[in-house]
Amino acid sequence: MNRNPDQNTFPNITLKIIETYLGRVPSVNEYHMLKLQARNIQKITVFNKDIFVSLVKKNKKRFFSDVDTSASEIKDRILSYFSKQTQTYNIGKLFTIIELQSVLVTTYTDILGVLTIKAPNVISSKISYNVTSMEELARDMLNSMNVAVIDKAKVMGRHNVSSLVKNVNKLMEEYLRRHNKSCICYGSYSLYLINPNIRYGDIDILQTNSRTFLIDLAFLIKFITGNNIILSKIPYLRNYMVIKDENDNHIIDSFNIRQDTMNVVPKIFIDNIYIVDPTFQLLNMIKMKTQIDRLEDLSKDPEKFNARMATMLEYVRYTHGIVFDGTRNNMPMKCIIDENNRIVTVTTKDYFSFKKCLVYLDENVLSSDILDLNADTSCDFESVTNSVYLIHDNIMYTYFSNTILLSDKGKVHEISARGLCAHILLYQMLTSGEYKQCLSDLLNSMMNRDKIPIYSHTERDKKPGRHGFINIEKDIIVF
């Protein structure tokens, strides 16, 4: 039986808090389920909605001025959401509403509200790079990698982009400046800060509070546009979340990383924004080119990639004094693949203190073998490398999440060999190890190469798990 609680049965303060929040006397079940949420509920109840409405209006004026929404519509949407619980009787939905309202109440002002106040002066920190001098070299390197054969019948899984991306980009530029200790960017926008001729779409970010930020941003978009906004979590991408609108159009995504990972990511400071060091990004690009769909992207628009490649090459030339004279020494390092066990052995003794690297193509197998080694010194850099690294008895153990290209039966393609070398160099950069000679040889090994056809490729590791999502309109959280 769903009876109302007796006023003398429950502590008056807790009951009053819940009753005020729900706008009704709670049932016995509601009281017992919600009483542990009394502190959060009280914060929501006393929250100054007028100040919050003012902040959202200011965010709208600054970043979404072209969206046709009136101030009264914004206020009505906000007040409607903060009273939604009064018309909700499902306990699960009430918990979702409380959780999401709590995020807004406790974090919105510091995360997005702060963007409406006067910003600190921008510290101009740009260096003039001669990117043009690297364009021909970049084109030559990419041309030798342009070996994918496009299957025209294959449907590519690229996302549709929301018209709000330009508004969110404008907000993100300011967000990156205000929150540069917890949020950094990489990808085309970060290279645009070095070379204004770079074209970019959405802004790629790594941050330490991704979930909270995306919830706050989703609500800001909802209150301004009135659209239902959904946050999705993809199981095969570590700590990744994306905001989409009700038509499944992509607005922004983010990878979450720990603060200790953020601290070791190599980065540079440009106009009050931290970007991932372009050297690191160049290595990651070389690594990702072993992924067959990335090579297909290259074949579709080589000039887009050429501008990015030339920018990164000029950065490493200027920063590290790399000389592009074709001196490759022992690069790429020798790679032997065991296709049955899905392990690639890379000979590293010419460059590093560990004599070889065992690269596992199945993450669960690596985890099991690390346990058998009884070693506790592994490094997990989360989505920054998508891999754990361990050095034990002069052998590096690591996981590689991409496909391995073969140029012949049992022979690792040089594109993948360089990708594996780059993967090892990412570890060296993250741990402040030596990498510059190896980097120089790796880049020089990409010069004056002929195209080598792809014979076949290994499949990527299959990641288990289910998709998670937060549906604001339907009050559902599934993670």
UniProtKB/Swiss-Prot annotation:
Polymerase that creates the 3'-poly(A) tail of mRNA's. Keywords: ATP-binding, Calcium, Early protein, Metal-binding, mRNA processing, Nucleotide-binding, Transcription, Transferase. SUPFAM superfamilies: Poly(A) polymerase catalytic subunit-like (SSF160957). Its EC number is 2.7.7.19. It comes from the Viruses. It comes from Vaccinia virus (strain Tian Tan). It catalyses: RNA(n) + ATP = RNA(n)-3'-adenine ribonucleotide + diphosphate. Ca(2+) 2 binds at D202, D204, D253. This is Poly(A) polymerase catalytic subunit. The gene is OPG063.
